[in-house]
Amino acid sequence: MFNPDSEEKIKVLYVDDERNNLISFKATFRDRYKVVTAISGTEAIERLEEESFHIIITDQRMPNMTGVEFLESILDKYPDPIRLLLTGYADINAVIDAVNKGKIYHYLSKPWDETELDMSIQNAFMTWRKRQDEKEENQKLTTSNDQLEFLLRQKLLT
């Protein structure tokens, strides 16, 4: 579980084509999280190649690549980050696409409410941590199973 007193901060990648939103997000959350921003889906992909993130938050309406298209494009290579979608438009088709194609965890409307967004980030991180714990446990079980199968084969051969 994440310890807020530890040195590690939750790492958030925030993607928005409006520079003022990037500045505002970073100013609001930089004390609580390690915030990296990107002004486009293309730049966000570059950031993902440089470092890993717990959470990705993206605006939906951006030129060249929508938030859903961005999330869908990174799904295979970067499956672990929890995805949140922000949009100022009540576009139900975008939300449906985000859930089905972009595998979003949560949808929020703009302008965002600081408390609501902060809670969404915290909840998303708890989900990320739980998934990582499950992966580790599954790996341990696989290793134990492999060892038991090996011992059983050895016993059957003797």
Which ranges hold each PLM region?
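Conserved phosphotransfer cores of two-component systems
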Residues: E49-E51, S73-D80, K101-G102
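C-terminal output helix
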Residues: N93, W112-I121, F125
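Non-catalytic signal-transmission and effector/linker regions of two-component phosphorelay proteins
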Residues: M1-L13, E136, K140-T158
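Helix N-cap/capping motif at the beta->alpha junctions
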Residues: T37-E46, G67
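Alpha4 helix (beta4-alpha4-beta5 surface) of REC/receiver domains from two-component response regulators
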Residues: E69, A90-Y107
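Receiver (REC) domain active-site loop signature in two-component systems and cognate sites
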Residues: M62
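Conserved acidic segment of CheY-like receiver
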Residues: E7-N20, S24-F29, I56-I57
